[in-house]
Every structure is written in C-alpha cells, then in structure tokens.
C-alpha cells in the first residue's frame, strides 16, 4: 500500500506523523465541497525535502491549495509544467520554501516540498469538489482512512494527532435520512441544513468514514 501524507525524501522515506487533521465539507445532492487541513511537525536536525501524497477520488477536482512551512505561506498558483519546475528549483537554490504539485495517478496527487528546516510546523490545506453519485436513492460520501491514518506505535509512539470531521448537508427537505455505518454521529439542524459531527473524539481513522444520505430526488453530476 502506498504511503500517504508527508514523506521525507532524504530521511530514509520515513513519514512525518500528523498533529492535526480537520475535514470540513458542504454537501448537496450532487456535489461535495471539501476542505482538508493537515498539520505536521518536523523534528529532525537538518534541512530536508519531502513529498506529500494526497488520495483523491476520480470524481474530484482540486480547487484550492495552501501550504505553510514555518512562517512561510505559499498559495497555489497554476503554471505550465516546465515553468513550474524551473520556479521550484530556483526557490530551492535560493534557500526559500517552495512546492511543486504533480498529479501522478487518477486517485492521488503528489506535492514536492523543499527546504524544510528542523523543528518546523508544516500545514497543508487542500480544497476540492467531488461528484456525489446516487444508487437506489442513496448517496454515499467517504473520507478515506489515509487522510488520518494510525501510525505504528514502535515508530512514532501512541498517536497524538487530533481528528475533526464536520459536514453540512444542504436541501434538508429533500432528505429522508442520514446515517453512518462506520462512525457514531451527532446532528443539529438550522433552516434547511443538517450539520453533522463525530459524536465522540477520535485520534485517527481505523476505517473509512462513510456517510449515507437517503433521498427521493433525481441527482445530476456537476463535474463532467
């Protein structure tokens, strides 16, 4: 299985453990608008480069990317591939923090991160939209385990990161039921919205987070 998350290139491919994971999603009956925030902390004793691998559904498209390495904040900017590589290498030579986004599979994309100093906090926020597909009047939305994995205790000690999953479902009047076969939920309601959070605190996903939305309405996919 591929390792997702932050992988240190010049440190024997070890993975930098997570500190915080937040998933914030707004769903209607055809589209999910999702933001994922992940924070890492590099405790090494020398500057390193790293790659960050993020799982992505074939039905999804990235819309926003924001990376903060220490006090340096880098916002995503679309460039032609050759220009982007030159820009990345130029900043690395200058000693500046930089990143290069490179999609390498249908279900995953990869970001190269450069010049990460010791005792540095790295935060990554990714926004994406995803088609929601309906089968027998049920929409199933999933947050994969790889967003917030459990690390082996002998490598990192007991998991210390914090996980939050917050979901808002629009068009409440078209929905008959919402449930999760994977995790206990708590619900609140406001106007025509359903707001959902995990009902108990967890530190990692030992299984995919699955949300089933039951409805009686025709659904049209937005992303073509």
Where do the language-model regions lie?
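Subset of Sec-pathway N-terminal targeting signals
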Residues: 1-224
């Amino acid at each position: 299985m591929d390792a997702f998350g932050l992988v240190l290139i010049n440190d024997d491919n070890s993975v930098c453990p997570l500190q915080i994971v937040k998933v914030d999603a707004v769903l209607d009956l055809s589209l999910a608008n999702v933001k994922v925030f992940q924070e890492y902390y590099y405790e090494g004793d020398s500057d390193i480069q790293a790659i960050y691998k993020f799982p992505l559904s074939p039905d999804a498209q990235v819309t926003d990317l924001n990376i903060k390495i220490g006090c340096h904040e880098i916002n995503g900017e679309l460039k032609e591939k050759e220009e982007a590589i030159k820009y990345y290498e130029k900043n690395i030579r200058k000693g500046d923090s930089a990143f290069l986004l490179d999609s390498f599979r249908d279900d995953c994309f990869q970001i190269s991160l450069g010049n990460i100093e010791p005792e540095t906090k790295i935060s990554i926020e990714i926004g994406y939209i995803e088609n929601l597909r309906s089968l027998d009047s049920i929409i199933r939305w999933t947050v994969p385990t790889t967003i917030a994995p459990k690390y082996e205790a002998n490598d990192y000690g007991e998991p210390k990161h914090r996980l939050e999953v917050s979901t808002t479902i629009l068009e409440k009047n078209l929905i008959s039921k919402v449930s999760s076969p994977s995790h206990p939920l708590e619900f609140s309601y406001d106007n025509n919205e359903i707001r959902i959070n995990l009902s108990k605190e967890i530190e990692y996903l030992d299984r995919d987070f699955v949300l089933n939305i039951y409805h009686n309405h025709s659904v049209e996919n937005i992303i073509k």
